[in-house]
């Protein structure tokens, strides 16, 4: 009988070693908001008005990759805008070497106010919608967004200066 108990315990122990505990998802490295960027790892903010080189360097370190492209659009209504874009959907906008705005389509980067790209319209906080030449837009506390063509989810979020043509 004792051997049977020992064997049962050994089998149970071996089986328990095969069970994995689900890991908590990694927290986002930053949160975008109406004033700029709040890194998760620091209380220091990256607000609008900061120098372009420092902002790009800081965000590149946070995302563990540099931007895929840095371009300048001289035909923006607000004046020439230089944009640093990451492949996942984040774009930072600069004018005269200063951080002035962002756009985001990356669902892994949260936006203050309870928004996230690709978030279902039904899961969004209370907002009012307006149909414009861009599509169905919304705003809350100086954070703006655009729904997908079928109005089912968030396609794009932004704050500050952008280069949209309406």
Where are the language model's segments positioned?
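Bacterial N-terminal signal peptides that target proteins for export
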Residues: 1-8
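Acidic/histidine-rich, surface-exposed loop or edge segments in extracytoplasmic proteins
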Residues: 31-42, 101-110
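C-terminal motif of bacterial Sec signal peptides marking the signal peptidase cleavage site
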Residues: 14-17
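Bacterial signal peptide processing site
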Residues: 19-21
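A cross-family detector of function-defining hotspots
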Residues: 23-28, 47-98, 113-166
């Amino acid at each position: 009988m004792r051997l049977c108990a020992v064997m049962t315990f050994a089998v149970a122990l071996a089986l328990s070693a095969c069970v994995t505990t689900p890991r908590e998802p990694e927290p986002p490295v930053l949160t975008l908001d109406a004033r700029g960027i709040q890194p998760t790892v620091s209380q220091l903010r990256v607000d609008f008005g900061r120098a372009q080189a420092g902002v790009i360097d800081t965000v590149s370190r946070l995302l563990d990759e540099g931007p895929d492209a840095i371009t300048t659009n001289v035909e923006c209504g607000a004046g020439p805008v230089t944009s640093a874009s990451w492949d996942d959907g984040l774009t930072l906008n600069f004018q005269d070497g200063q951080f002035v705005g962002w756009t985001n389509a990356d669902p892994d980067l949260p936006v203050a106010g309870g928004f996230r790209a690709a978030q279902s319209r039904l899961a969004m906080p209370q907002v009012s919608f307006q149909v414009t030449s861009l599509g169905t837009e919304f705003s809350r506390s100086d954070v703006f967004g655009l729904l997908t063509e079928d109005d089912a989810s968030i396609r794009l979020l932004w704050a500050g200066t952008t280069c949209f043509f309406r």
